[in-house]
Amino acid sequence: MADPGDRLGVLTTTRRVVEQAQAVWIDHDAVAQIAEAFAARQVTPPTWNRELHWSDGREALANYILVLDAVNFCFWGEPRWRIEYAGAVYDGYWALAASLKRALEQGVPLTDASYLAEITRDDVATIFAGEGEIPLLDERARILRETGSVLAERFAGRFSDAIAAAGRSAVALVDIVTNAFPSFRDVATYRGEQVRFYKRAQILVSDLYGAFDGSDLGAFDDLGELTAFADYKVPQVLHHLGILRYAPALHDRLARREEIPAGSPEEVEIRAATIWGVEELRRALASRGHALDAYQVDWLLWDEGQRLPAGTLPYHRTRTIFY
């Protein structure tokens, strides 16, 4: 049975995983306790970061957000990839954002579909140059070329055309993106059934909302239908808060920083439980008079994850282009 308001199919398909999971489960008592604490603090999600995100012009900004989230995946590795920008050192997602901003400020035409369609591995290596190499460099180069080609062929080089076609619907834009751009089709198989996550497509929509302050190309009437963005950091935070529980064998593998294969039952269970851990927390907050959408709860948890104490269980390590 489909969950009400789940036109994306993410809640419905991940619910089946949570109900059958063998290695990951949700602690409902912990959900209630954390909801009480968050409601008492009147926590609010972070605002769009304009220091590290590039912004210049309406259509160029829309194309930039597409590029940003086309390569918004897999930052872990040893040694950890870092870059220096404006006198500070960044790693992870913020290194990605700063790298793209640095390149655009240096005149690299990253918002031009024809340039993207022909971008080389060396070009991409230069854009992300820093300490160490960004993981999955070849995949990022391939995806940027694919993104440029689709953008040129399907949308005349303007992602704003795709946004306009969605008619202020976040759900419609996720559908357009996942159908047009193959790298955004974040779907797994669990016990013979398809499971949808659409992490980067959904975060793309929420990033448009943030970058445009909820107006113009960032205006959507159904943002509340987005789910959490199942990545590395949010499940780590949920586990730290006690909302996610892991079977001992999986807990030990994570503690050893052992790689969890993409598409494995354990990886799919972690991601599905992340979707529902956030959804249950959202509902618990709403019942306590603190209404947030799932994507806002996700933003809040991701931001909390930037300040986890030493000794926190490491996030799961999976080599994938989807997150």
Swiss-Prot record:
Catalytic activity: queuosine 5'-phosphate + H2O = queuine + D-ribose 5-phosphate
Top-rank taxon, per record: Bacteria
EC number: 3.2.2.-
Name of a matching Pfam family: Q_salvage
Transmembrane segments: none
Positions contributing to queuosine 5'-phosphate binding: N72, Y93, K199, F229, D231, D298, W302, Q306
Molecular function per GO: hydrolase activity
Gene Ontology BP annotations: tRNA-guanine transglycosylation
Entry annotation: catalytic residues: D231
Keywords: Hydrolase
Broadest EC class assigned to this enzyme: hydrolase
Function text: Catalyzes the hydrolysis of queuosine 5'-phosphate, releasing the nucleobase queuine (q). Is likely required for salvage of queuine from exogenous queuosine (Q) that is imported and then converted to queuosine 5'-phosphate intracellularly. In vitro, can also catalyze the release of the q base directly from Q as substrate; however, Q may not be the biologically relevant substrate. Shows a very low activity on queuosine 3',5'-diphosphate, and cannot release q from queuosine 3'-phosphate and from the 5'-nucleotides AMP, UMP, CMP or GMP, indicating specificity for the queuine base.
Family: Belongs to the QNG1 protein family.
Subunit structure comment from the entry: Monomer.
Record protein name field: Queuosine 5'-phosphate N-glycosylase/hydrolase
Gene that encodes the chain: qng1
